[in-house]
Amino acid sequence: GLENHGLLRVRGVRPNDEKELEAVFAEYNQGRYKTAAFFHEFIMMNYGAARLTDSYIRRAYALCRKHDTPTVADEIQTCVWSPEIFMFREYGVTPSIAVVGKGFPGGEYPASRILFNAALDTLPLFGALVTNGQEELASLAYLVTLRWAEANAEVTGAVGDYYEERLRDLASRHSGPLASIEGRRHLAGINFHELG
């Protein structure tokens, strides 16, 4: 495909490895290369609930500013579970693009959204209508869920903190089989020493 013809290259970076991150940005922002975007999740549930550190995210966003590289925060799983509604707010960053979905429309209407900052939102009004219409239902589901999430943010945070605290307590009491607790609040995972 495109990668075989030298037109693009997708480059993964180890989570929380700031040295590798810096090396990749240095390598791919010179000569014939230019980073097109930095895609990331804050908590990678498919990787044992690995959580990107504050330091790593701050460094990544600084490199993106330096190299004029858009940031794309995948908030499909994390949004609404944060008392700040979006996890990026907890990290103190503002992505160029945020992708939301799953729980955000409250389970009432299956829909995902891509939110752009003003610099990247260049489509004219109605420039990207969907084929089958009915976007007003999805939009309403999002707005209702957003209002509910804002009204219940304190409870969401408290329940999530309690859940994480209880998981960490469980891990400390059962350190034989349990290696660690990863993630944050509702989005947490239990790592075992063995899967025996």
Briefly describe each language-model feature range.
Residues 1-196:
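Conserved N-terminal phosphate-binding loop of PLP-dependent enzymes in the Aspartate aminotransferase
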